């Protein structure tokens, strides 16, 4: 079958790869003008995805991870208050993204193509683009266009993401930016700090080129802070060029006012071991934490995956792995069907996936509230 994917981030690329592996003609349409390299931080290794790719002849060494060995909590003075053994393998968003791109036929990736509208009939879907390019027909369209999905809004009018009451300041900074003594306690551990209405965590991820060598790796950090005033969120989401972003501001695009706020808050409110990470980060970025859940993960010949289907709180550590599970399960569901069975198969797949993520949708807000983050439950 011919399958079109709207959105070329990890969820869209993962679907493109699994569906290509199972014999479909797949094309990805990404609105950004070029590749999205360097736009994310750490991610948990996608074990199910790796198994699937290896079964289909792809080497996945580029998704290697830095293991953390302990989960350590510290206080404002840097003293360890809790220290538990825990092995967690972390890769990086850009390493996973680059690896997925490298395994896809270059001709299947189309940048600078934003889907404007779709029209479905009994035989397929016609896709129109904002730039006025010739429409494309496909047997199936996969919406992988993120938390603020335009396609989800078109399919289910009135359905929108809802702000959860807190934000995540984020960044990555090279391990070799520091004297090794200064960061010795942060290396190969997950280090966390909690105070009223905020939570900071950091861990190592591979270098931008995928290297795991000591000194070449990067610290990934996340700082969750309550920001219940939505007018403040609007200011933070307004980038240096005056553009108001929907839910996140990419690296290098924070306004001078937001950067000044971040640096002052880190200096005043974080342990020295952690504030130095923030101060040394050249291009921090921002994510407003939101909840989104599509009424269904499919409608007709259109399927929704990744954050377009539902947005999980980052505390679950499941956002990227959910995208991988979406991709693998969808490829398996579509592996042997005929064109006439598409709608029924997508309906069954959608019900299965929605049921699978239901526990994670409940877990995220509970974890946030246990840290004092977000709006209280009603």
Predicted regions and their residues:
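Glycine-rich FAD pyrophosphate-binding loop
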Residues: 20-39
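Active-site-adjacent segment of FAD-dependent monooxygenases/related oxidoreductases
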Residues: 33-103, 371
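Conserved mid-domain beta->alpha element of the FAD-binding
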Residues: 7-21, 25, 142-143, 169, ...
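Contiguous C-terminal substrate-recognition/catalytic subdomains in enzyme active sites
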Residues: 233-286, 290-291, 297-298
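Conserved FAD-binding catalytic core of PHBH/FMO-like flavoproteins
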Residues: 62, 79-80, 87, 91, ...
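Conserved Rossmann-like nucleotide-cofactor binding loop
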Residues: 11, 34, 148
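Extreme N-terminal starter segment of soluble prokaryotic enzymes
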Residues: 1-3
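C-terminal domain-closing interface element
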Residues: 370-378
